[in-house]
């Protein structure tokens, strides 16, 4: 998008258009989470170990992170509509090819490709912020994040349902077709933006390093967000291990249904956007960190009481999603003309937390069981608290 678009007065976005963008965010981001409830189904289908199937979850986050680092920065340089649609088409074909995986190499390769292209949501969010009037920008980010969160939530339920009644391959094939159809819709509805001729590809990537070096506030918010996402990723990756084993013995579909608890994230994203817009950033931060920290108490009893487990999941999900919206609004204020690049730096670090959380879940479960997972959540939450409080003190100076 050109600088002119970012700096001139723009009319309020229509509710239908915001809904369209939010749906696109959910569709794209959700595909990176299909394999979380499918670990045991993939293991059985391909004849591989649980840890090998679980590593596909880690690779999904790595692929998404690579896309964030390499492609999202181009949102400040290229025509955003072309970039978004191209990424959706690439992701769609990768998902279709993933559905034909017959060995571990194909599973891993096309998992990375599919999630590499799924980052179009991360181009769309700063785009929506840039074309919004300043007074509604925070609320728009919250609504788009609500769509993204809903996509992630429903993706697990969709994957569990299709896998239980058809196969895990059908999950990716059907999603690929839907994504292709939606890419066509996005091409007709999204506004076209001119390429920024003042930027070059090399200059864009250099500016990422410059942002990382000169904006410690950005790095601190990203690191705090990454640890929060590590908590959530750990909770949802280990959910299959907890619920598919005694005493619950849930199916893929039942695990996906349990994941619907994450619907709380829709309300927390919207609430956070509105509350931050009123200037209550510190209140949001303290509440969110408290929820993530104290979620360890009910999560400790996950294998004994399903209600306690549900409460812990709700607390961690609300805390992380609201905290993420807070962080995005804080870092977008750094430079309105570089929001795609700022988002790239923030989200690359943020999604490294997802990979860390997934990897920690697999490793901790293998070596220490559920108690190892809960201890890891507590460590991550303490890290968030320390980084967040230090950042707020630095910003007050």
Where are these regions (language model features)?
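Helix-to-loop junctions at the C-terminal end of transmembrane segments
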Residues: 68-79, 268-281, 365
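Intracellular juxtamembrane helix-capping segments at the cytosolic ends
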Residues: 120-132, 322-335
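Conserved MFS/SLC helix-loop-helix module at the cytosolic interface between two early adjacent transmembrane helices
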Residues: 66-104
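Structural signature of the two symmetry-related core transmembrane helices
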Residues: 82-96, 283-298, 378
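C-terminal transmembrane helical hairpin of 12-TM major facilitator-type secondary transporters
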Residues: 282-327
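Helix-loop-helix hairpin linking two adjacent transmembrane segments in secondary transporters
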Residues: 106, 143-190
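Cytoplasmic helix-loop-helix junction between adjacent transmembrane helices
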Residues: 111-147
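Juxtamembrane intracellular "pre-TM" segments in multi-pass secondary transporters
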Residues: 3-12, 191-222
């Amino acid at each position: 998008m050109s600088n002119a678009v970012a700096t001139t007065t723009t009319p309020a976005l229509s509710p239908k258009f915001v809904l369209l963008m939010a749906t696109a965010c959910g569709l794209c981001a959700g595909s990176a989470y299909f394999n979380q409830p499918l670990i045991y189904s993939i293991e059985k289908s391909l004849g591989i170990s649980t840890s090998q199937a679980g590593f596909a979850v880690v690779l999904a986050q790595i692929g998404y992170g690579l896309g964030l680092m390499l492609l999202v920065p181009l949102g400040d340089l290229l025509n955003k509509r072309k970039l978004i649609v191209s990424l959706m088409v690439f992701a769609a074909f990768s998902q279709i090819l993933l559905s034909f995986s017959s060995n571990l190499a194909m599973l891993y390769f096309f998992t990375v490709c599919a999630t590499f292209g799924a980052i179009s949501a991360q181009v769309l969010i700063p785009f929506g912020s840039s074309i919004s009037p300043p007074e509604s920008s925070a609320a728009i980010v919250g609504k788009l994040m609500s769509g993204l969160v809903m996509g992630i939530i429903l993706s697990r339920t969709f994957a569990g349902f299709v896998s239980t009644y058809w196969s895990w391959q059908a999950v990716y094939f059907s999603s690929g077709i839907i994504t292709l159809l939606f890419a066509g819709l996005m091409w007709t509805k999204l506004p076209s933006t001119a390429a920024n001729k003042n930027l070059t590809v090399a200059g864009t990537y250099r500016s990422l390093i410059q942002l990382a070096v000169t904006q410690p506030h950005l790095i601190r918010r990203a690191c705090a967000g990454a640890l929060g996402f590590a908590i959530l990723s750990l909770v949802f990756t280990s959910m299959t291990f907890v619920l598919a084993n005694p005493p619950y013995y849930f199916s893929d579909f039942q695990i996906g249904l349990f994941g619907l608890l994450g619907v709380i994230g829709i309300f927390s994203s919207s609430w956070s956007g509105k509350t931050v817009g009123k200037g209550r950033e510190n209140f949001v931060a303290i509440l969110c960190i408290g929820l993530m920290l104290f979620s360890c108490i009910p999560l400790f009893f996950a294998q004994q009481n399903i209600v306690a487990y549900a409460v812990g999941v709700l607390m961690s999900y609300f805390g992380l999603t609201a905290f993420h919206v807070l962080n995005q609004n804080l870092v977008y204020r750094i430079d309105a003309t570089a929001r795609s690049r700022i988002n790239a730096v923030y989200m690359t670090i943020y999604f490294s937390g997802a990979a860390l959380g997934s990897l920690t879940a697999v490793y901790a479960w293998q070596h220490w069981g559920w108690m190892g997972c809960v201890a890891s959540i507590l460590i991550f939450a303490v890290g968030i608290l320390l980084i967040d409080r230090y950042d707020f003190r630095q910003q007050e100076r």
